[in-house]
């Protein structure tokens, strides 16, 4: 996932989506609480969010798949990704111990996702 390609960005978001989905299944009670899955999912989110801004190269500022607002607000964009990573690391350090804890963690992480997507994601039809 180097070079900041469109495919690399999609692959990273899919990793976060998969990890979030695994946490969501536990939070909703669709899957039993499993500390290893929670740990793995939070680790994936923390590491992937940290790497995500590196996939945006200002030299690719003509890429139609990239919202131009990212270039205008690169520090904010990076800060939003860093907050998601930090919040996932914090959750990892205080590992949610049950379904409710996973749900509360997801609310925090989901807020980070929403804030960045609202500001920077290009809506597809």
From Swiss-Prot:
Query: Which terms in the GO cellular component ontology are assigned?
Result: periplasmic space
Give the record's PTM text. Answer: Binds 1 heme c group covalently per subunit.
Q: Which of this chain's residues are annotated to bind heme?
A: 13, 113, 116-117
**PROSITE patterns, from UniProt?**
CYTCII (PS51009)
Q: Where does heme c bind?
A: 13, 113, 116-117
Which Gene Ontology MF annotations are present? electron transfer activity; heme binding; iron ion binding
Which keywords does this Swiss-Prot/TrEMBL entry list?
Answer: Electron transport, Heme, Iron, Metal-binding, Transport
**Organism domain of life:** Bacteria
The biological process GO terms on file are: electron transport chain
Question: What InterPro entries would the database entry show?
Answer: Cyt_c/b562, Cyt_c_II, Cyt_c_prime, Cyt_c_prime_subgr
Query: Which Pfam families does this chain map to?
Result: Cytochrom_C_2 (PF01322)
Q: How does it assemble?
A: Monomer.
Function, as annotated, reads: Low-spin monoheme cytochrome c.
Please report the name of this protein according to its UniProt entry: Cytochrome c-556
